[in-house]
Amino acid sequence: MLTYLWVAIGGALGSMARYWMAGAVAAITGAEFPWGTILINILGSFVIGVVAALSGPDSRVPVPGDIRAFIMVGICGGYTTFSAFSLQTLELARGREWLQAGGNIVLSVVLCLIAVWLGYRLGAVLGNPERQS
């Protein structure tokens, strides 16, 4: 049960960090292109990769499961879900599961784009029933 608390705390910290970082990058680069989101996803992927490599079953660094969950699921999950996607794709590729790795990339991008489009349309309809697109 304590692990859930660590994940929740990490998620809150990751979410606050994401909000701050996105705003800071937008203040520098402008809001025309999502540089903040790209940077956040890259950093989150980097962090989850480092922690996975340092604390995985083949590592010599003893990291308790609560701390691993706090960082990987909590902080990285709150900061970006792209980090988990990236790690899973890397693990497939490292296992020479090229078709699955490619499928994960294509399906994730395409399905997430469809989902955000559908969600956007639903939000537009709920927010303004006369607006259909």
Where are these regions (language model features)?
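Membrane-interface helix-loop junctions in multi-pass transporters/channels
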Residues: 1-133
